[in-house]
Amino acid sequence: MLGTGARMRKKSNPNGKIKTTCTRGLGFVAIVGFSWGLFILTRLAGPVLAPISREGSENRNALDTLASVPPAKNDPSMWQWNEAPEDDRLYLVFSTDCSGYQNWQSLAVFFTADAVRQPGTIVRIASGCSEAEKKEVQKLYDTFPVRFQVHFTPNFKKDAKSGKSYDFYNKPYGLQHWLDSKAAPKHKDAIVALLDPDFLFMRPLTYKVKQDRVLYSPPVTDGDLIDEVREGHPVAQYYGIGSQWTKFKVEYIAGKDSPASKVSISDASRYYSVGAPYIAHVKDMRKIAESWANFVPRVYEEYPHLLAEMYAYSIAAAHLELPHLRLDHYMVSNTQAAGEGWPFVDRLTDKYVCSAEAPDQGQEQPVFLHYCQFYRVEHWGFHKRRVATNLFTCESPLFIMPPEDLEDTHWKDNGDKKTMYSKQEAQRAAYMLCNVIRKLNGAAVKFKNLNCLAGSANYTQEIKIW
């Protein structure tokens, strides 16, 4: 099985703090000076809920039926792959290496996509795998529906010219490798959505913008909304990375006459302060991938920090004059951040914050949970770096589910002290904790149901992260 290892892993930095491997939140601006960045909260105008249809909000999510042990024993959808609406235009891709850490995250992407019956094709781009790792991964993925695929690439972590290593080189180079391969989309009007591997589906992703439930923040207005993603009109999630890249040596990075060098600070924030999911017409994504791969080593040369690849994407999009429609509703991640899908969560009544019933009761949800922060309420916690790599095995137990009234607790345990929460902070943290754990448990249960011999699967809820 994939990801053999200890049940629990509590791994931290020498200074006792867990590494964060994602942007510290929408509505934050990274300031150069520290290896992980110093972040200053920017006060942003409130989000706007677009007055449009709620098509698809009634979607039934099979994994969310998990409520007891053994879970969902009588739910047929937990013992077979679900059928999803066909869409030969839509491709969702995400970049990983072949570590156990990213193996379990990848499986979580596929199983939660299956749970919401995500249309289209989903592709894991796996870079730097050994031949043995490729064989092991492919053997498992051969049991998946044809709409779930893996594409292997060389390891791009070291830049051939500079000799410098950067984990996230794999992201643009891997995307370009896939787009140049025989596995690339065949439809001339295909839409490609680039995700992160630490995404869990709460509802299906669609490229039909106005048929979705949309959130956006000023300066974006209702007049900026488009019917759907099309050539020349990409869409992405708002990230608070701001306009810092305009202060880089843009002419060195993108060329003397690059349009990127002429982008104003306000336009950089409005059109290019974005992150995953990036959603674009395949022709646009090909051009972006090429420029992104060309620019990222030069950006990293000037800015050798975590966000280099995101800034390189912004410069590539600006260079190609492909302004992005910046939307807020695609994901939630940082409980204190503006510009995410939190208005959906803030409007939930208490009974639905930690309840699996929310989607079935017409409660609005973000598309993804982006679980890249440390979430804590009371004595409950979750961080992806503390998840054992053997989560998706027959032997591994499941997570203990937090109580459904967790949002009523307005404090968190920091070890040596308690930190008080506002009601909103408690509700957001509880939402992330309950739903990430429920989603991962449901995914692990379905993995066991599909892959383990009768009587050999461990359904006990024993894992608790703090």
Give the residues covered by each predicted segment.
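Catalytic core and acceptor-binding pocket of nucleotide-sugar-dependent glycosyltransferases
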Residues: 248-360, 367
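Short secondary-structure boundary/capping segments
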Residues: 108-110, 139-142, 207-218, 320-323, ...
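Short catalytic/ligand-binding loop motif for oxyanion handling, primarily in non-cytosolic enzymes
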Residues: 102, 132-134, 159-160, 200-204, ...
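N-terminal anchoring/stem segment of glycosyltransferases
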Residues: 21-170, 179-188, 445, 449-465
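C-terminal catalytic/acceptor-binding lobe
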Residues: 320-466
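E2/UBC-UEV (E2-variant) core
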Residues: 229-261
